[in-house]
């Protein structure tokens, strides 16, 4: 038995030795195969390079490798592209860009370049044009090929070696552009968007393969894409969350600048910088950058931009006006900012700027701002004089008459005189009335209420509400409820205070007002519920206990009612004592 076990052990050892020898041999063979494969690839590349015509060999120097990413940094794909302009303009396939948030770019040598902006896209022909910032740009000239001619598909080195092919059919689309059906052995869909060149090294199109169908679409079609002002809202380009370039035309660029506000904040900022770089003599870019800086709380940068605008803009009046207007809006609370305004921003500074604007180019709008600033300085007589002079000019603005009425009110004019100006402001509004006329109906409505003409006031306030449907806050409905109470319009008042409660459910005073009004219209149960809600929101709110107590006494809960009224008295409510005396 022992001898048998020893023999078996020897047999196992011999088998393991043979297996080890076989394994080592296989490893050597695999290593040799990998080496041969690598050598084969290098030889293939070398042989392909030697097989290419001289003009084709240099095409690779014009290629780019694009890597597209989503917002979270996930890589979407790797795409070939090619330069067609010395200013960094390139073309590629469009589909890989859809859903993309950023693009990494490398040139033929592997050096990183910066993606700048989209210059056009077509999802039907699957082409896009864009710009990159590169240290060295070698654009290809565009050319053509005829049926039967030899062509080459040339991707970046990172995506493979050039592949020779042939034009099967040369056709046209959109009248003047070429479309080629190709036969390219060894090509695949990973080369979609790669350059297809003729034997002169001219770019005839971009390669596409779908199934077994191979083709090239004329790069001239993408070259001729033109961005306009409305391109910022182009539904195809907006499928990629990438910046869209500015047009070359000033007028179109101004439109694009306004629409670029809907892009990502970083892209919007880049568009503003591009605008300032392209059109340093226009005020629009500096003003846009000012508002962007104010939104970020960089108030010093906002001031610097306004100063830069004054220094660089060709229309000095516009630049000074913008400076004055921004200061005025900020100091009067019409433009919110983070932090404190620059120390130099005063109403005197604003007035000086707008006076310089008017001196450079007298305009109604400049004089109007001048009057508004003087009013904000509480110089009401001087402001009124200027507003009156503006009222004699064209265009006749309802705002001017409203501001005259405000001056008169500050100077102590009688109600009839103020009302006459407010009626004039409504009279000069465009008809049929639109939302722009709402402020003038509102101001006249408040003046009617001040004069005790509550029903006329209600008509104007209803118009104001109509023009602002869905945009009014609880404070408006509370204000109108107070006017309705004075006019003894209790049902309308109740509806408005309940609307205020719905819009501001945590505002205890609105619920207390609702409870008080319920008592006035003899609805004690509803009054009690409103009061309980007040106490729930704020247990230390004395009016809530007073209203609850009064409601309870009317609901035959006298003991509880008196207890709550006494609690309101103890909490400092001055009305509680008079109610207690009546009850006792």
Language-model features: locations:
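Register position in tetratricopeptide repeats
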Residues: 295, 329-330, 376, 410-411, ...
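Short, small-residue-biased leader/transition segments that mark boundaries at the very start
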Residues: 1-3
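Flexible, gly/ser-rich surface segments that form the specificity/activation loops bordering the active-site cleft
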Residues: 52-57, 136-181, 186-192, 207-217, ...
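Catalytic-histidine neighborhood of serine endopeptidases
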Residues: 85-126
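C-terminal cap/linker of serine protease catalytic domains
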Residues: 53-56, 205-267, 271
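Canonical tetratricopeptide repeat
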Residues: 288, 322, 369, 403, ...
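A conserved glycine-rich beta-strand in the N-terminal activation segment of trypsin-fold
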Residues: 52, 69-93, 112-114, 192-194
């Amino acid at each position: 038995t022992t001898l048998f076990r020893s023999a078996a052990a020897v047999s196992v050892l011999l088998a393991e030795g043979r297996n080890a020898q076989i394994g080592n041999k296989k490893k050597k063979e695999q290593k040799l195969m990998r080496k041969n494969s690598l050598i084969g690839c290098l030889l293939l590349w070398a042989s392909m390079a030697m097989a290419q015509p001289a003009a084709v060999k240099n095409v690779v120097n014009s290629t780019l490798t694009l890597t597209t990413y989503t917002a979270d940094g996930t890589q979407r794909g790797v795409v070939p592209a090619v330069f067609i302009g010395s200013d960094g303009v390139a073309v590629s396939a469009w589909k890989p860009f859809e859903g993309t948030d950023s693009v990494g770019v490398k040139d033929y040598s592997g050096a990183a370049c910066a993606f700048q902006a989209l210059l056009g896209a077509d999802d039907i022909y699957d082409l896009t044009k864009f710009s990159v910032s590169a240290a060295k740009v070698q654009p290809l000239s565009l050319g053509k090929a005829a049926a039967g001619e030899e062509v080459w598909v040339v991707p970046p080195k990172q995506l493979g070696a050039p592949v020779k092919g042939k034009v099967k059919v040369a056709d046209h689309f959109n009248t003047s552009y070429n479309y080629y059906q190709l036969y390219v052995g060894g090509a695949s869909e990973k080369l979609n968007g790669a350059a297809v060149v003729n034997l002169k090294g001219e770019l005839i199109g971009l390669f596409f393969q779908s199934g077994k169908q191979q083709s090239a679409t004329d790069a001239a079609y993408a070259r001729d894409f033109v961005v306009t002002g409305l391109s910022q809202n182009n539904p195809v380009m907006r499928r990629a969350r990438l910046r869209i370039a500015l047009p070359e035309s000033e007028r179109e660029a101004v439109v694009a600048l306004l629409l670029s506000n809907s892009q990502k904040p970083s892209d919007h900022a880049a568009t503003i910088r591009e605008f300032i770089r392209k059109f340093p003599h226009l005020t629009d870019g500096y003003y846009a950058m000012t508002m962007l800086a104010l939104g970020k709380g960089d108030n010093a940068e906002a001031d610097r931009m306004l100063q830069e605008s004054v220094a660089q803009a060709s229309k000095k009046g516009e630049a000074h006006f913008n400076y004055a207007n921004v200061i005025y809006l900020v100091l009067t609370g019409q433009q919110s900012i983070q932090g404190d305004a620059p120390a130099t921003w005063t109403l005197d500074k604003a007035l000086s700027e707008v006076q310089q604007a008017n001196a450079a180019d007298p305009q109604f709008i400049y004089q109007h701002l001048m009057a508004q600033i003087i009013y904000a300085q509480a110089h009401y007589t001087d402001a009124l004089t200027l507003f009156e002079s503006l009222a004699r000019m064209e265009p006749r603005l309802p705002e001017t008459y409203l501001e005259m009425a405000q001056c008169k009110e500050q100077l102590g004019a009688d109600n009839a005189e103020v009302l006459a100006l407010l009626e004039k402001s409504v009279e000069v509004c465009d008809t049929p009335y639109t939302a722009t006329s709402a402020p003038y109906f509102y101001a006249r409505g408040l003046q009617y209420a001040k004069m005790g003409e509550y029903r006329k006031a209600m008509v104007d306030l209803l118009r104001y509400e109509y023009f602002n449907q869905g945009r009014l806050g609880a404070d408006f409905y509370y204000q109108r409820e107070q006017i309705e109470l004075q006019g003894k319009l209790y049902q309308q008042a109740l509806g408005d205070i309940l609307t205020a409660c719905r819009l501001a459910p945590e505002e205890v005073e609105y619920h207390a007002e609702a409870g008080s009004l319920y008592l006035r219209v003899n609805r004690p149960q509803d009054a009690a519920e409103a009061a309980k809600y007040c106490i729930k929101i704020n247990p230390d709110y004395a009016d809530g206990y007073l209203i609850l107590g009064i409601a309870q006494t009317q609901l035959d809960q006298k003991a509880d009612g008196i207890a709550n009224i006494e609690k309101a008295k103890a909490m400092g409510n001055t009305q509680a004592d008079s109610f207690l005396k009546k009850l006792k």
